[in-house]
């Protein structure tokens, strides 16, 4: 059991280390404060973030293929892979996404109070893939 725990921790650390330094472009409404807080969360986790203000987020989401049922306030694109990140996705889930190139995108629909940029995480935040299936729980 101890070996399994150590192996799991090593995999998690490796995944996060791989993600550190990745670049992500974040499209957001210029008047959104929670978007800026989420960007800061990513920067604190080691991501390079390029914010892009947009007055037409609906068009951005449509162009990037974000399912309407999963929409939130901001949309990110991992620059190296083109993977899409919708809403207040935790940096840990973003690292898992980058390590899974077959996954097109992930989302935290809406604006949950227990998500980065909105409030304190409590271990119950669910990130889903674009098919709506659970991808991560943080």
Spans of model-derived segments:
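Thiol/selenol-based redox catalytic cores and closely related redox-interacting motifs
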Residues: 63-138
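Soluble non-cytosolic domains of exported or imported proteins
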Residues: 29-36, 51-55, 88
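Conserved helix-turn-beta segment immediately C-terminal to the redox Cys motif
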Residues: 39-58
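Short active-site oxyanion
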Residues: 23-24, 47-49, 80-83
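Local sequence-structure signature of Cys/Sec-based thiol-disulfide redox active-site neighborhoods
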Residues: 18-45
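Hydrophobic h-region of N-terminal signal peptides that target proteins for export
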Residues: 10-19
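Positively charged n-region of N-terminal signal peptides that target proteins for export
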Residues: 1-4
């Amino acid at each position: 059991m101890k070996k399994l725990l150590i192996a799991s921790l090593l995999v998690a650390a490796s995944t996060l280390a791989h993600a550190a330094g990745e670049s992500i472009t974040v499209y957001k409404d210029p008047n959104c404060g929670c978007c800026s807080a989420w960007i800061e969360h990513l920067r604190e986790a080691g991501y390079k973030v390029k914010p892009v203000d947009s007055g037409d987020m609906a068009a951005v989401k449509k162009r990037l293929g974000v399912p309407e049922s999963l929409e939130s306030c901001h949309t990110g694109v991992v620059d190296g892979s083109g993977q899409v990140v919708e809403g207040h996705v935790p940096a840990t889930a973003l690292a898992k996404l980058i390590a899974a190139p077959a996954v097109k995108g992930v989302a935290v629909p809406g604006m949950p109070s227990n998500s980065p940029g909105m409030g304190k995480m409590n271990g119950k935040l669910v990130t889903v893939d674009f098919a709506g299936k659970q991808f991560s729980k943080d």
